[in-house]
C-alpha cells in the first residue's frame, strides 16, 4: 500500500503533543551533537589513558570511569529524566481516554483480514515482570500497554519510524531461503507488529504470524494490521514455546528480542 491510515491514537490535547515534542527534542539534544556527550566522554577517556600511561582495560573499567565523572552522571541523569517525562505525559494523556481506547481495541479484535488469538489462561513467566525502558506497568499489565509502547517508541526514534520505516528497512535486509520459497514467516516477540506487517508487504502471498506474551501489545498489533489491510495473524505465545511444529517456517525473525532479555 502506498499510504497507510493513522494507527496511533491522538493524545488527549494539543498541549500533550507539544510537551512530547519538547521531550523528543530534548532526547535529540542529549544523544546528538547538541550536548555532544559521547565525543566529550571519549576525549576524557583518551586523556585519562594518556595521563596514566596505559590503555583502558575492559568495558567494566570504562563504565566505572564514566559513572564517576560529572559529565557521565549528567548525561545519565538527563537521559533518565527525559524518559520519565515521556512516560508520565503519555500515560496521563491516554489514561484520560481509557474508555474510548479500550472500546477502540474491542472494535477491531474480531475484524480481519488476519486473526487475533489470545489465551485467557495464559501464564506469564516471571521474567516478563522486568519492565524495560521504564514503561509504566511493563508490557502487559495495563490494557493500554500497546498504545503506550507505540507512542513511546515514536518519541524514542525521534520521528524516524513514524511509518515503520526502520522495520521495513530491517525486514528488507533479511535474506530469503536458498530455494527462494517463502510460504510461512514467524515474527518472534512481535510487540505491536511493525515487523510482521513489513514481512507481509514484502511477501504478500506468505502466511505471516507474530507472537508475543503481551495481550495488550497483540491487540494493538492486530488493530494496526487490520486498519492497514494487512493479512497478518497474531497469537499470544512464548518464544520458547511457540506452539508450531519444528521447521514449520521458512523465515523466522526477531527484531529486538535479544536486546531485551533480562
Q: How should these model regions be labeled?
A:
Residues 2-55:
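Intrinsically disordered, low-complexity terminal regions of plant proteins
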Residues 56-140:
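N-terminal auxiliary segments of SAM/dcSAM-dependent transferases
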Residues 125, 139-164, 194:
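A short mid-domain helix/strand-loop element embedded in enzyme catalytic domains
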Residues 148, 161-181:
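Conserved alpha-helix/loop element of class I SAM-dependent methyltransferases that forms part
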Residues 181-191:
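Conserved class I S-adenosyl-L-methionine
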Residues 186, 196-241:
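Class I SAM-dependent methyltransferase SAM/SAH-binding core
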Residues 240-252:
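A short acidic, Gly/Pro-enriched loop at the edge of an enzyme's catalytic core
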Residues 251-262:
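A short SAM/SAH-binding and catalytic strip from SAM-dependent methyltransferases
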